[in-house]
Amino acid sequence: MFAGLQDLGVANGEDLKETLTNCTEPLKAIEQFQTENGVLLPSLQSALPFLDLHGTPRLEFHQSVFDELRDKLLERVSAIASEGKAEERYKKLEDLLEKSFSLVKMPSLQPVVMCVMKHLPKVPEKKLKLVMADKELYRACAVEVKRQIWQDNQALFGDEVSPLLKQYILEKESALFSTELSVLHNFFSPSPKTRRQGEVVQRLTRMVGKNVKLYDMVLQFLRTLFLRTRNVHYCTLRAELLMSLHDLDVGEICTVDPCHKFTWCLDACIRERFVDSKRARELQGFLDGVKKGQEQVLGDLSMILCDPFAINTLALSTVRHLQELVGQETLPRDSPDLLLLLRLLALGQGAWDMIDSQVFKEPKMEVELITRFLPMLMSFLVDDYTFNVDQKLPAEEKAPVSYPNTLPESFTKFLQEQRMACEVGLYYVLHITKQRNKNALLRLLPGLVETFGDLAFGDIFLHLLTGNLALLADEFALEDFCSSLFDGFFLTASPRKENVHRHALRLLIHLHPRVAPSKLEALQKALEPTGQSGEAVKELYSQLGEKLEQLDHRKPSPAQAAETPALELPLPSVPAPAPL
């Protein structure tokens, strides 16, 4: 408790103990100790007895004086740190640290020592090592001091960052399995600026500060974890951290990160959920501006483009461009904007392979994607448009048109063999579901059972699909629709993929009142957890069971329904109005 006082020549409890042990008159010894070590203020001696009369303990008085002096000292240290030339003020702080460091383990004075260290841009190495070696001191020191420790101790910094990265991934994954199913409030709804206010991003931003070395360490952790897990949420964090530092105008980092301007431009596109022609040209300029010998930058750019929020924006923009091309009667190969979107999409999707192989080249675009797959997708858009127009015609002008219900074999093959085709195809499915286009959805569902890398059974697609399906709630009363959706799609993968099982249960929990009773019973049985199912599936299934029980209680039994007479309410008798 009194560690360090002796080094400064200040008497402490041990000195008093020794004095009392060796003295013959303890009361006189105590009085002398108080005189020598009390507050040396002549006017105070006459005031202290007055405090005694009021029953105020001397300890309480001295503690209040001590606290006041400590606060003044802390203010003075902060003032020194902001006054005069840098060299002079740092010299003063270093001298102060040298004199006070021996008190660092004394709880009452520790804040002063920590404050001095906090304001020093370079704390002496010896003192940093002493702080690092003591867990209590390390925990108590300011983040400004910790940064100086971390920059030369990657393992310790990794220990600090690791729990935050785990927390971030858990938050993203739990958002994808949210109980709310909505088109308006989904995983991609929060704006980039809102997302950057999240706890993990803010704490990482604070930990990095303006330290380029720590920033590079975080990026290295994110690359390593992305390679190890293939989890694309690490790519999101890479972009969010850079833009969080951008928001704070941390030029020391933003000016040295070659991806800064590219990320800034892409961030604006994500905010608008669309890549317009002007920004498309800017993004193209950054890609074309990568000089020979600097190709490694492509690895970082691809990781930023692999962020699900970037992929979502690029894919939505691609589908929108295809719709515009249909109206303009233009082929995909003749649209520079569309080709650039595909180039960016390909770079994002190839991020893992590029970083893993360390071959920093843009992926080659499949010619057939542009000359065959996208025109085929445009023909689907034409089918949708002509069918919708026909349905709106007066009865006498309607032609007996039925919506195409088969898929070209080549389309299914594209979804299975080409990642780019699969990604764009899945976003087309999301588009037609959002348009409440039941016919197009039923036509495409069989093609989703087998896709490149099982992308159709990925959490992001299923999260968006289940949200969009809420718009088709009335169709769930039709057994054929439920059979196509559940039996023909979800149940083909739910036994082997727990995430699909969870998304199917989420959808059913939300829409169970609309599902035909016979089909609901069959689905409840089909989605029953097995012995290998995780807790999340069991919890969702339990929730579904509770919802169905509540539904049963609300429904009248057949006997009650038969006994209930027709609702004939007698007219209430109305009193005659009083005479005026």
Swiss-Prot record:
A biological process from GO: cell population proliferation
Localisation per UniProt entry: Nucleus
Gene Ontology CC terms: cytoplasm; NELF complex; nucleoplasm; nucleus
Expression by tissue: Widely expressed. Expressed in heart, brain, lung, placenta, liver, skeletal muscle, kidney and pancreas.
Annotated S-S bridges: none
UniProt keyword Transcription regulation present: yes
Entry keyword annotation includes Cell division: no
GO MF entries: RNA binding
Region (Disordered): 548-580
N6-acetyllysine, modified sites: 519
Pfam families: COBRA1
Record PTM Phosphoserine, positions in chain: 557
Main subcellular localisation: nucleus
Listed InterPro entries: COBRA1
UniProt keyword list: Acetylation, Nucleus, Phosphoprotein, Repressor, RNA-binding, Transcription, Transcription regulation
Family to which the UniProt record says this protein belongs: Belongs to the NELF-B family.
Quaternary data: The NELF complex is composed of NELFA, NELFB, NELFCD (isoform NELF-C or isoform NELF-D) and NELFE; the N-terminus of NELFB binds to the NELFA:NELFCD subcomplex. Binds RNA which may help to stabilize the NELF complex on nucleic acid. Interacts with the first BRCT repeat of BRCA1. Interacts with KIAA1191. Interacts with NELFE.
Protein task: Essential component of the NELF complex, a complex that negatively regulates the elongation of transcription by RNA polymerase II. The NELF complex, which acts via an association with the DSIF complex and causes transcriptional pausing, is counteracted by the P-TEFb kinase complex. May be able to induce chromatin unfolding. Essential for early embryogenesis; plays an important role in maintaining the undifferentiated state of embryonic stem cells (ESCs) by preventing unscheduled expression of developmental genes.
Name assigned to this protein: Negative elongation factor B
Gene it is expressed from: NELFB
